[in-house]
């Protein structure tokens, strides 16, 4: 368990009948390490005056990929109507917000994302693959399941590799200024001949719209 506070602050973590203490360093960071805990919950965790309720202890899975991993569960409701009445508080889902970072790993995740449960009021915010995996795993083990989803449809593998390792492949290294110029140029679509008020379109043919 880790976090931030003013430098030199003593932090007490109370969980499952035990106490753990740590003092922040000059950078304001603190961390406590707990021994393995029995699977179950929900539990209450207290960090100084902060209370964190509905905490589960169980298995946590990292789910990553492209659109197949990111597909929202609401697209599957027609095929699996039981999703609408999901009532499982022992499975949890966290979707990492998409954030463009070009140079270094970030310590904090952008946005206001949070853990959500598998109850009907929250399940429509899940990704589909994570939901069915968590449900199957919980039904077979009885252990709470946490699905940490870090995915982005259509992303290339290079997007998931640090610059340190990409340096071994010079053909993948792009000049920052050239990349920025390319991105800016892509926004300029131009006027286009078709947009001129005096263009003669009398010889343009007709076409049927797909699906009509």
Q: What kind of region is each of these model predictions?
A:
Residues 1-212:
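Cell-envelope and extracellular/periplasmic
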């Amino acid at each position: 368990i880790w976090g931030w506070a003013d430098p030199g602050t003593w932090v007490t973590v109370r969980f499952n009948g035990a106490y753990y203490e740590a003092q922040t360093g000059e950078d304001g960071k603190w961390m406590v390490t707990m021994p393995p805990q029995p699977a179950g919950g929900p539990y209450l965790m207290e960090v100084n005056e902060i209370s964190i309720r509905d905490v589960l202890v169980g298995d946590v899975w990292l789910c990553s990929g492209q659109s197949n991993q990111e597909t929202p569960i609401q697209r599957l409701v027609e095929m699996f109507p039981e999703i609408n009445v999901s009532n499982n508080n022992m499975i949890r889902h966290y979707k990492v917000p998409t954030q463009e970072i070009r140079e270094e790993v970030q310590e904090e995740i952008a946005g206001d994302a949070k853990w959500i449960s598998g109850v009907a009021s929250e399940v429509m915010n899940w990704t589909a693959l994570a939901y069915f995996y968590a449900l199957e795993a919980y039904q077979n083990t009885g252990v709470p399941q946490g699905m940490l989803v870090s995915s982005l449809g259509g992303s290339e593998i290079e997007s998931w590799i640090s610059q340190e390792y990409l340096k071994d492949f010079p053909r993948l290294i792009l000049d920052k200024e050239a990349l920025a110029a390319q991105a800016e140029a892509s926004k300029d679509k131009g006027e286009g001949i078709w947009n001129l008020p005096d263009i003669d379109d009398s010889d343009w043919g007709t076409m049927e719209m797909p699906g009509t």
